[in-house]
């Protein structure tokens, strides 16, 4: 059963501007170290950072909380299977929310171009 759906879109240039202005501090605020390493393993990391930003926003919307006190940036980690399929690992408050809602998984889909990144998240029992 579907418990929630969230979607987000962001301009890659906004993420690039934040990376340029705040550097590592911005990245460490929104991403796990594994996510930073993955994004920066690509020649142009900004679209990959933007996709993870959008994925976390979409996931928080699927929970109905948004990013804030109930669910923070580091409570969600976007990972990839060997096939390339993305998935979300919930930590801390995210894991607690999953248990409180009797949710067993969050499905996500990511897409990005040079200009935009978007994500769709579905919270299921």
Describe each region flagged by the PLM:
Residues 1-125:
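Core catalytic alpha/beta fold that binds nucleotide/phospho-ligands
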């Amino acid at each position: 059963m579907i418990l929630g759906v969230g979607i987000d879109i962001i301009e890659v240039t906004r993420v690039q501007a934040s990376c340029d202005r705040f550097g590592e501090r911005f990245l460490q605020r929104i991403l796990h170290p594994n996510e930073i390493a993955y994004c920066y393993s690509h020649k142009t990391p900004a679209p990959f950072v933007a996709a993870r930003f959008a994925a976390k926003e979409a996931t928080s919307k699927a929970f109905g909380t948004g990013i804030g006190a109930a669910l923070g940036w580091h409570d969600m980690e976007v990972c990839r299977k060997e096939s390339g399929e993305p998935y979300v690992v919930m930590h801390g408050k995210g894991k607690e929310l999953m248990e409180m809602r009797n949710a067993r998984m969050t499905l996500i889909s990511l897409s990005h171009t040079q200009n935009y990144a978007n994500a769709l998240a579905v919270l299921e029992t």
